[in-house]
Each structure stands twice: as structure tokens, then as C-alpha cells.
Amino acid sequence: MPFSENLIPLSEKKLIYGVKDKPGIFVKAFPFITTNKNDILMEIELQNIGAHLGLSPPILNTYEDQQHYYIVMKRIKGMSLADYYGENKMDIPNWVWKELHRIIRELFINGIEYIDITPYNFLIEDETEKIYVVDYGHAKKVHMNWFVQDFLNGIKQWNPDFA
């Protein structure tokens, strides 16, 4: 059980922890009693896709003990949009909304429908103001039509299936 004895709670509700003497990582815990392991594995798979696209913190490791499944992630030096700007949608700058639309669109183009769009699920990095999406618990895989995907990626032609 690496890290278990060194976990520092960052959030009571979400079971998010820092790790003593390891400032570059954080841990998300899933209690087995309330979470289906297949749902956890799907969340890991979807976040790995997001990380590959540069939209989410990379998952560094996973492990489990008798009560929890843990996801160990790179810690983003920043805070949630809720902590940075507050919860009021009117206080969120236009550039942030544009970036959120781009992120959700990019995920969708890559087969992920991300619906948990709240200021708590997006982190803004301190130095670069890059925005990351986290918490893929309500996300799901979607299959996009090959032509629609190509079209959204910039192809300039009509759908040959309907020509």
C-alpha cells in the first residue's frame, strides 16, 4: 500500500489527498463499498485518453487496499475554477469559456462525452493558466461517425454516404 500512511486530505467529499513529501502528486480514493470497480476502470481509461490529449493530469499509478481503489495523478500547481473565480458563471472570463468549449469538443471528437461541467472539475494551472479537466466519473465513451469526426477535424467535403 504505497502512500496510504502518508495521505493528507485535501477534500472531505471527494476523497482527494496530497501525499506527504511528494508535492508533485495527488491521490483520488474510491471506497469499494460505494463504487463499482468497472466504473473506476472506465474513469481511468477515459482520463488516460484526456491525459494523452494534454487535457488532463497524467495518471502515474493505481493501487488498491482492502477498502479503497486509488488513482495516483500528477498534481497540477493551481486550483479549481471554482476556487479561482467562484461559482458564478458571470465571473468566468470569456477566454475560459472558449477554452472549456474547446476541451469538451476535443474530448467528444476523441470519443468521450464529458457532462460533469462544473467549475470544480476544471483546474487552472498557476503559471501558464492552462486549464485541465478532471473527474471522469460521469463521462462515457461515445462512438462518433467517422465522417463527422473527419469533418470536425477540418475535412472539406460532403459526406460520401449521402452523395
Put a short name on every predicted segment:
Residues S4-L41:
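ATP-binding glycine-rich loop module of kinase domains
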Residues L41-I44, N48:
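AlphaC helix of the eukaryotic protein kinase fold
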Residues I49-G54, A82-Y120:
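Conserved kinase catalytic-core helix
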Residues P58-Y69:
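Short beta-strand micro-motifs within the conserved protein kinase catalytic domain, predominantly
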Residues L60-T62, E113-D126:
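A short glycine-rich, hydrophobically flanked beta-strand micro-motif that places a catalytic Asp/Glu
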Residues H68-S80:
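Conserved short submotifs of the Hanks-type protein kinase catalytic core
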Residues E125-A163:
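C-lobe/activation-segment region of protein kinase-like
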